[in-house]
Design a protein with these regions (language model features):
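TPR-repeat structural position
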Residues: 9, 13-16, 51, 85, ...
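Short coil turns that delineate tetratricopeptide repeat
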Residues: 31-32, 66, 99-100, 133-136, ...
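Canonical positions in the second alpha-helix
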Residues: 25-26, 60-61, 94-95, 127-131, ...
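Structural motif corresponding to the intra-repeat A-B loop/turn of tetratricopeptide repeats
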Residues: 6, 10-13, 48, 82, ...
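Start-of-helix register in tetratricopeptide repeats
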Residues: 1, 34-36, 70, 103-104, ...
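Residue-level recognition of tetratricopeptide repeat
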Residues: 1, 5-8, 43, 77, ...
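Canonical tetratricopeptide repeat
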Residues: 39-40, 74, 107-108, 141-144, ...
Length: 363
């Protein structure tokens, strides 16, 4: 499991192969009732974005040991990414019934975050922080609390949470990302860029590379932006050549900075195995950028159907409504996006404000 987490957080696919080799050896030595290895295989499949396989392995692990909370956690993750939100909630409840530890409470927090209940999500994440027994659990909780504060428009609280986490884990990429987003929201764009650069040096993950590239672009540093985008393309090639489905950030990158037509194809491939709200948003944006805004609207609606508070998704739907001539609906989404403006990176914030000015929306 440690190798899986290391691969997921460092973007090193070679570690997945090492983890799989160890897990399959365990299964060969104990082919039946090996809930630990089956849970590991489920986590490995989820890390590779093979969510149907993750669900199957998690169900095997639960059959082997119905009292394995970690198996219910991976099952919840798989159901979430497959778009089976009620099934995910039931799995999270079972996980918490068995062991209400940091991991269980963090998943419960995410259930409420997806539903737009950020206050309840923050409350549960604080309980997760209190229950944390490892530095990685504490770092994860602080990063999530920072993100929830941004979604609520409180950039200073977001910065405080990120900095608390970084005092214990100064090289944690998720915390560096969280601080960068908070700094950007507070207008400290150069400091934000430095944090994103540090984060990508540690873990060149797609969402970090995209944030760094778009921040360089917002600052007019086109050469540096292109360097980040080139690395993002290379990372996506590594993922897909290893059999993984396209990442949502790679789809959004392609839609905005590459070929929208290719972005549509990537999103369609991702949706075949992952009907998650973030994939619907990426597909909607790719369709819109490819000139297919009428088709895009249904997917933008699906992305926001749970009530998730996400400034970027609201901006995307606002742009789609505007393209379709429905400025009243665009105005409503822009108000949601600009009300959560701290959650937008500098490039997206500027784009949302520009759209607002074009249609006369007051934030």
């Amino acid at each position: 499991m440690a190798r899986i987490e290391q691969a997921r957080t460092t973007a090193d696919p070679a570690l997945y192969a090492a983890a799989e080799k160890a897990l399959r050896r365990s299964l060969s030595l104990q082919p039946g009732g090996n809930s630990g290895a089956e849970t590991g295989m489920a986590a490995l499949a989820a890390a590779r974005h093979e969510f149907t396989a993750a669900r199957t392995w998690a169900e095997k692990a639960i059959t082997s040991d119905p009292y394995n909370p970690a198996a219910y956690g991976v099952l919840a993750d798989a159901h979430t990414q497959l778009g089976h939100y009620r099934d995910a909630e039931r799995a999270v409840q079972k996980m918490n019934d068995l062991r209400p530890d940091a991991a269980s409470l963090a998943r419960a927090s995410y259930v409420f975050e997806l539903r737009g209940s950020t206050g309840r999500a923050a409350e549960l994440m604080r309980r997760s922080l209190t229950a944390a027994t490892t530095d990685s659990e504490r770092a994860f909780a602080h990063a999530c609390l920072s993100g929830l504060a941004l979604e609520d428009g409180d950039a200073r609280q977001a910065l405080s949470e990120a900095e608390q986490g970084l005092r214990k884990a100064p090289a944690d990429p998720a915390l560096l990302d969280a601080r960068a987003r908070a700094l950007a929201a507070l207008g400290q764009t150069k400091q934000a860029r430095a944090d994103w650069q540090h984060a990508t040096d540690i873990a060149p993950l797609p969402h970090l590379l995209l944030a760094l590239g778009e921040t360089h672009q917002a600052l007019g540093h086109d050469e540096q932006a292109e360097a980040s985008y080139t690395l993002l393309r290379a990372q996506d090639t590594l993922r897909t050549s290893a059999g993984g489905s396209p990442d949502t950030d790679a789809i959004l990158f392609e839609a905005d900075h590459g070929s929208p037509v290719r972005a549509v194809a990537m999103a369609e491939q991702a949706l075949r195995t992952r009907s998650f709200v973030a994939v619907h948003d990426a597909y909607a944006w790719a369709l819109h950028r490819a000139g297919r805004s009428e088709e895009a609207l249904a997917h933008a609606d699906q992305a926001l159907a749970l009530g998730t508070r996400n400034a970027l998704w609201h901006y995307h739907r606002a742009a789609i409504h505007h393209a379709l001539g429905n400025d009243q609906a665009a105005t409503a989404d822009l108000r949601s996006a600009l009300g959560q403006a701290p959650a937008l990176n500098p490039l997206h914030a500027a784009q949302a404000r520009a759209l607002s000015q074009r249609i006369g929306t007051q934030p």
